[in-house]
Amino acid sequence: MPGLTLGDVVPDLELDTTHGKIRLHDFVGDAYVIIFSHPADFTPVCTTELSEMAGYAGEFDKRGVKLLGFSCDDVESHKDWIKDIEAYKPGRRVGFPIVADPDREAIRQLNMIDADEKDTAGGELPNRALHIVGPDKKVKLSFLFPACTGRNMAEVLRATDALLTAARHRVATPVNWKPGERVVIPPGVSDEEAKARFPAGFETAQLPSNKCYLRFTQVD
């Protein structure tokens, strides 16, 4: 499944991890899961990223969201590297599993291959890909960063909150949205349905087109 993208079902891979063997669909279960790859163990940007993800792990856990890291190094390398990650920012614990994928099969199927980066032997490396997978095993959101650019974990959390809010209330979230702020009502929802669904009411932006498509409401 080299073209894995939004709306696709992730393959039910059998994976070797720092927590033992898992099947991906079983791991997802009824939860949302953040699947994220890093190019290599014992590298600078990856160390800061994994440390930061460990720092945010409690926030994801509060939301019932699981974390699953991916790299091409083996399990023993991952376990040794975790010691460095935890020492870099004392008090942060890497409690989530990290997949070992030395044959590159998992990252190929999850569309995480970097076309430009290679290891010293010329082997393929993953880019900084991140997929948020829903309970239906479908990709709900993807980020794709090059090896030179670390991801923003605060934005990953914000985007996760937006997805969860949209799924729970059947709404959409506007630009720069944060939890607690107003959401927008999708165009396919009539005013009559909106009145029934949103007891707090809604506000329609007055625009030069006189089209009533930008409607804001508040949800819990």
From Swiss-Prot:
Alphabetized UniProt keyword annotations: Antioxidant, Cytoplasm, Nucleus, Oxidoreductase, Peroxidase, Redox-active center
Compartment(s): Nucleus; Cytoplasm
Enzyme Commission (EC) number: 1.11.1.24
Highest taxon of the lineage: Eukaryota
Biological process terms in GO annotation: cell redox homeostasis
UniProt motif (Bipartite nuclear localization signal) ranges: 195-218
Main location: nucleus
Record's GO cellular component terms: cytosol; nucleus
UniProt key word Cytoplasm: yes
Active site location: C46
Coiled-coil zones: none
InterPro entries, alphabetized: AhpC/TSA, Peroxiredoxin_AhpC-typ, Peroxiredoxin_C, PRX_1cys, Thioredoxin-like_sf, Thioredoxin_domain
Further remarks about this protein from its record: The active site is a conserved redox-active cysteine residue, the peroxidatic cysteine (C(P)), which makes the nucleophilic attack on the peroxide substrate. The peroxide oxidizes the C(P)-SH to cysteine sulfenic acid (C(P)-SOH), which then reacts with another cysteine residue, the resolving cysteine (C(R)), to form a disulfide bridge. The disulfide is subsequently reduced by an appropriate electron donor to complete the catalytic cycle. In this 1-Cys peroxiredoxin, no C(R) is present and C(P) instead forms a disulfide with a cysteine from another protein or with a small thiol molecule.
Family stated for the protein in its record: Belongs to the peroxiredoxin family. Prx6 subfamily.
Listed name of the protein: 1-Cys peroxiredoxin B
Species: Oryza sativa subsp. japonica (Rice)
